[in-house]
Design a protein with these regions (language model features):
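Acidic, glycine-rich flexible loop segments
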Residues: 99-132
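N-terminal small/polar-rich segments of proteins
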Residues: 2-81, 121-152
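A signal for specific C-terminal beta-sheet/loop modules enriched in small/flexible residues
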Residues: 49-51, 93, 113-117
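Short, solvent-exposed coil/turn linker segments
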Residues: 37-40, 93, 104-105
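Acidic surface patches and DE-rich sequence motifs
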Residues: 73-74, 84-85, 108
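Short linear motifs in low-complexity, proline-biased tails and propeptides
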Residues: 95-103, 136-142
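Short, surface-exposed beta-strand/strand-loop-strand elements in extracellular ectodomains
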Residues: 82-98
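Generic N-terminal initiation segments characterized by hydrophobic and/or small/turn-forming residues
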Residues: 77-79, 91, 102-103
């Protein structure tokens, strides 16, 4: 802001003063991700398909100011990875997933892909299917998803 002329010529400009206060609006918007239920399935001959389901949520007030949910996988070039907790060299990549509502797929630093929801979206659901026909080395695995907010 700047000094402005008095609104009336009855106010002498030599008698005026100007001051301004400073206001800082901090970003308190954050996302949360639900922890998926644990899946227990046989290494071979699974009798059904399984899915890892994530729900990413931001506060309604953050969605209302235009904050957008972004999410990405742990994989170096975007596939979701199911990684053995005892030996990280054992992993399986999954490129197929579904989301609701649909998001835009964008390229970030180093070509890393991420998904960006529209403004106003408060919740994004992401489902990564673990194929029924897959054959996996027995062990404990994790499959991660990262999320954050874009405010612009």
């Amino acid at each position: 802001m700047a000094v402005t002329q008095p609104p009336s010529n009855t106010i002498s400009s030599s008698s005026t003063a100007f001051a301004q206060g400073e206001i800082e609006i901090t970003n308190n918007c954050k996302v949360s991700i639900t922890t998926p239920s644990k899946i227990v399935r046989p290494a071979t001959q699974a009798t059904q398909a399984y899915s890892v389901n994530f729900t990413i949520t931001q506060n309604k007030s953050c969605a209302d100011i235009g904050s957008r949910i972004a999410y990405w996988s742990e994989g170096s070039q975007s596939p979701f990875r199911m990684v053995n907790t005892s030996n990280s060299n054992i992993f399986y990549s999954f490129s197929n997933f579904s989301e609701s509502p649909s998001t835009a797929l964008l390229s970030g630093t180093g070509g890393k892909k991420y998904s960006l929801a529209n403004k106003g979206v408060q919740i994004v659901n992401v489902t990564i299917p673990i194929p029924q026909s897959g054959v996996y080395i027995p062990g404990r695995y994790t499959l991660g998803l990262n999320a954050g907010l874009v405010i612009n």
